[in-house]
A protein has these predicted regions:
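N-terminal active-site beta-alpha-beta segment that forms phosphate/nucleotide-binding
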Residues: 1-100, 104-106, 110
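Surface-exposed, charge/polar-rich loops and edge strands
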Residues: 2-4, 11-15, 110-115, 123-127, ...
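Redox-cofactor binding/interface segments in oxidoreductases and associated redox assembly factors
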Residues: 46-48, 117-118, 173
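Short glycine-/small-residue-rich Rossmann-like dinucleotide-binding loops
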Residues: 49, 120, 151
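Charged helix-capping and loop-helix junction motifs
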Residues: 61, 130-135
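Short glycine/serine/threonine-biased micro-segments
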Residues: 95, 124, 128-132
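A short beta-strand-loop-alpha-helix capping motif that often carries His-Thr
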Residues: 118-119, 132
Length: 174
């Protein structure tokens, strides 16, 4: 079931109207910036988007302008990732085709106040279907800070979560 939902949503993401997507991205960025978890955070982790995903660069720029420390993920092994400081001059394309830091010092989970979590589909309980690698579920399993995700309306789907799935605390959608 997860595979069919993932495939259908990825197809919908690929064909979405670019202007409408950009408008929704701006609206969701404003909602994150007004969110109490973001307001209280000193260190914010997000992701560098694939073309079809929520454009997190507006969030990154706003967080930097507000003096917050911004982190992005780096894959360090099968199913394993860490968060490193965002430095656009140090980004390289990863095996998965997304940008990630070339190098840097991993930031301890306890020092991350908010993680902006990507996903392909989310159910009404905050559980997500990702791209299938389990990176975020493993990382979030013992993470104690705040989590938030941003998705488009059509990414909301009902499915049963599995034992290893970790929900996000809040999902913002447009």
């Amino acid at each position: 079931m997860k595979e069919s939902i993932r495939a259908a949503v990825l197809q919908a993401l690929a064909i979405q109207d670019r202007e409408k997507k950009a408008q929704k991205d701006r609206e969701m960025t404003a909602l994150i910036l007004a969110h109490p978890s973001y307001q209280a955070a000193q260190t914010v982790a997000t992701y560098l988007p694939m073309d079809h995903e929520f454009d997190s660069y507006g969030l990154i720029e706003a967080a930097q302008a507000a003096g917050k420390r911004v982190l992005v993920p780096k894959v360090v092994g099968p199913g394993q990732m860490v968060f490193l400081p965002y430095d656009p001059s140090q980004l390289v394309e990863s095996y998965f085709g997304v940008l990630e830091p070339r190098t840097g010092q991993a930031v301890d989970k306890a020092d991350i106040d908010l993680i902006h979590v990507p996903g392909v589909a989310f159910n009404g309980r905050g559980y997500r279907i990702g791209h299938g690698g389990g990176y975020y579920d493993r990382y979030l399993a013992d993470y104690q800070g705040a989590t938030i995700s941003t998705i488009y309306d059509f990414q909301r789907k009902e499915f049963s979560e599995e034992n290893h799935d970790i929900p996000v605390q809040e999902v913002i959608y447009r």
